[in-house]
Amino acid sequence: MKSIRRGDGLNVVPFIDIMLVLLAIVLSISTFIAQGKIKVSLPNAKNAEKSQPNDQKVVVISVDEHDNIFVDDKPTNLEALSAVVKQTDPKTLIDLKSDKSSRFETFISIMDILKEHNHENFSISTQAQ
């Protein structure tokens, strides 16, 4: 009669080691992804205030140097932006990031849309000098 050896089985320790390394990589990379992807060179301001982080939902409207408009890093146009602002709760903060090389007309168009929909809770991002 054959004897059954105990101890034969799958060694999971190397698998756990690999999973921990992958977890560390994912966590370190995810901090870089959280940053905005649209490159916007903000205008300088001497009296710029540092924004206070809070748990409030923020909708970010970005305008790049070629006057392309983005809502939360997704490309859009003025008509679609108007629909987004209309659907957004008036208490939700809208952060406007306009590139210093973009046309002022685009900035004013966005401000008109905010005013049209009575959305007064917004901030304009600048870079401290």
Swiss-Prot record:
Predominant subcellular localization, coarse grouping: membrane
Membrane topology note: Single-pass type II membrane protein
Keywords recorded for this protein, A-Z: Cell inner membrane, Cell membrane, Membrane, Protein transport, Transmembrane, Transmembrane helix, Transport
GO terms for cellular component: plasma membrane
Pfam families reported in the protein's UniProt record: ExbD
Membrane topology, Periplasmic segments: 34-129
GO molecular function, one term: transmembrane transporter activity
Domain of life: Bacteria
InterPro entries: ExbD, TonB_ExbD_2
Residue ranges of the TM segments: 13-33
Keyword Transport: yes
Location(s) in or outside the cell: Cell inner membrane
Cytoplasmic side: 1-12
Assembly and interaction partners: The accessory proteins ExbB and ExbD seem to form a complex with TonB.
Similarity annotation: Belongs to the ExbD/TolR family.
Stated name of the protein: Biopolymer transport protein ExbD
Annotated organism of origin: Helicobacter pylori (strain J99 / ATCC 700824)
